[in-house]
Amino acid sequence: MTHIVLPQDILIRHIGERNITPYETLQQAADPSHCIHIAYIAEGYTEAEMPTFIKDCRIAMEALFAHEPFKSLRSRFNIVAVKAPSVDSGTSEPSKGIWKNTALHSHFDTFYSDRYLTTLHLKDLHDWLAGTPYEHIIVLVNTEKYGGGGILNSYNLSMAHHPQFKPVVVHEFGHSFAGLGDEYAYAKEEINMYPKDVEPWEPNLTTLVDFHNKWEGMIDKKTPLPTPEPTDLDKPNARRDKWKVGAYEPAGYAQHGVYRAYPDCRMRTNAHPEFCPACTQAITQLIKFYTEE
């Protein structure tokens, strides 16, 4: 799909290159004409804290490229760090009555969920990024509190100073970049997000209604569907080399009727070190879509 932009369009305001937010290039793609542009942007970092922001960006970047297929296709990414300064350090926590004056006005408690960290100020976000090379956005928030959020083709937002920063920022990028769904469910609360008679659009979830275009081709013919979880799942000494691609419950916030491809995945837990085969396949296809003619 192609969207044509005509620079001479009368509805396009020409502002030149003034007032561009300072940024640093963290990685240059091998071929700038066929690459994916990622911009990290600071949220809740004061001017004095920008060195910390750049350090956090490098940590997040290396965490992403520790995962396949990003690791093998790293040269196809161009990455910048955009230094958007905030008046206050940190982010807002409405449930505690804490409101901060920050570049993107981010806050926890989105939809009244304690750990759902987002911003609704998309115009501000893109104003800060104007004039910088970007397609996909990763917002790093200067907070120690656990939380984040990822919205497909919009942005990924993650806390930067919690011990689980690295797996969370990669997990959220799975949402915002590749449209991956969450592969977990809550034991005490089932969210009926996916009708059981409709195939989810997310490439790593299925209701088995229209499974043919997902990861069906990866499954051994002897593997039963649905597939029982291995008995060593979530145990320290799990024999992951014995795990198989299948259709496992729970997934997609539902205990039953929605399936994931593999026992564990970056889209299921923070403990698992990699994306599952279905997610890896989907991410690979998308990277090639962006970077190959």
Question: Language-model features: where?
Answer:
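Extracellular/periplasmic catalytic domains that process cell-envelope and extracellular macromolecules
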Residues: 30-34, 71-74, 129-134, 239-240, ...
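Propeptide-to-catalytic entry region of secreted or membrane-anchored zinc metalloproteases
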Residues: 2, 7-126
